[in-house]
Amino acid sequence: VKGEKAYIGRLEIAGNVETRDHVIRREFELQEEELFNGKKLRLSQENLNRLGFFQSGVVLERSPREHEENMLDMLARLKESQTGTFQAQIGYSDFSGFSGGLTLSKGNLFGTGRTLRLSAQFAEQSVQRKFDITLIDPRIFDSHISGSVFASRSNVQDSTEFERGVITENSYGFSLGSPLYFRDLRFSTQLSALDRLFTDSEDDLFKRSVAPAITYNSVNHPIFPSSGIKTSFSVIQTGTPFGGNIQLRELRFNYQQFWSLNLSNTLILMAKGRWGLLQEQGNSPIPSEDRYRIGGIDSVRGHYYYNISGPFGTNEQLLYRQYRVVTDELGYQQTKTYDSRTINLSSSELQELKSGGISERVFNLELLFPFSQDENSFVRGLVFLDAGNVNSESEQYSLLGEEEPEFFDLRKSAGFGVRVITPMGVLRFEYGMKLDKRPHEIPDRFEFTVSGLF
């Protein structure tokens, strides 16, 4: 009867073949025999949709009981979707030659709601190889506590001026997280260890870190969002009092927002930004491998990977490269290259110059649109605008006679792409053009990425 209070009867589930019942039931804000609450009904539906385990549009069906009109039975009618993804990537640069990678991710592992991720990356030159494994449990023992464990191993040829041979990195750790006040705001802490070993140097590095973070996430789908915000702020404290021989603090802020511009959710605008700052602690210098370098499909497209790397990066040195002929002790002549900005610097001043930055900022704006009126079109277009830069220590700019960039002094690029959605996944073709090309730089760059579902 309209106006009378109603109570929840049975909460039933249909259509879950792989997903276990308790994984679904723990997302219900409504409970059996409690007073019906429209807000809790909406939140329950949002929780199920945001899992990413089911086709979008999950609705809890309500049906009154015969002879008990104040009792409502609820039915979650589900249709499971693919929860495994793979991503393959291939590229080329003067630094690493041909490179590639493969990432496999299985969500809802064995129907438990857990996620397992495996990845491998390689490069033709510089002996680059990297392997990662991560296991995530979003609801430990069906509680609101989330946890993850991870481990990785990588090998790469030292490309810095230190020439320390092959660098082997072994890292491992775990994290725990919990909601703060409401569902979308979470606090988490990660404890990690990293051992960086060199074949041609005895100065091995051992990092022990703790990273508290606050995250807000309201996106409506974990893989293909069309609305919502995802943002986080974290502080990564390395060294004292956690051990190791590196003292370092890093601040990181990330922001991403999605807007659906039409009713069918096919015209989507995405804005993203990130900022990072490295701070020396005590007398421990910032390791070269931890300094910021940007460029490529994940930051500023149209640039080679990590080619934007401060006033003494490879890209900047090419701009000021000059040649001179020197005669060695045996009387043989050799042609040497040098940076014209460093010719009057002393040995101690040269040691202050380092590739990479201690701060970074990256901004991305994307518009994804269909090529036809059919909302199920499998071909989507993309236009984008990227901007970003890194800054090094002020002393480096002074030594090189350069002006330190302001926050909004950025390298910029724009471009377009096509994404082909197939039953096996998404093919991405993206072309980026530099909007501020320098004399020695190529004007553009094409990149191809394969990502998919299984």
Model-identified regions with their sequence ranges:
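Acidic, glycine-rich flexible loop/linker segments
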Residues: 241-242, 250
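Extracytoplasmic gating/loop element in the C-terminal half of outer-membrane beta-barrel translocons
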Residues: 72, 262-394
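Extended, domain-scale alpha-helical bundle/helix-rich regions
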Residues: 2-4
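Gram-negative/organellar outer-membrane beta-barrel architecture
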Residues: 18, 29, 34-232, 249-251, ...
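Short glycine-rich, acidic/polar surface loops and turns
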Residues: 366-368, 411-419
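N-terminal export/assembly leaders
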Residues: 20-25
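Flexible, small/polar- and glycine-enriched "cap/hinge" segments at structural transition points
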Residues: 144, 179, 381, 386-388, ...
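Outer-membrane beta-barrel transmembrane domain signature
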Residues: 268, 388-414
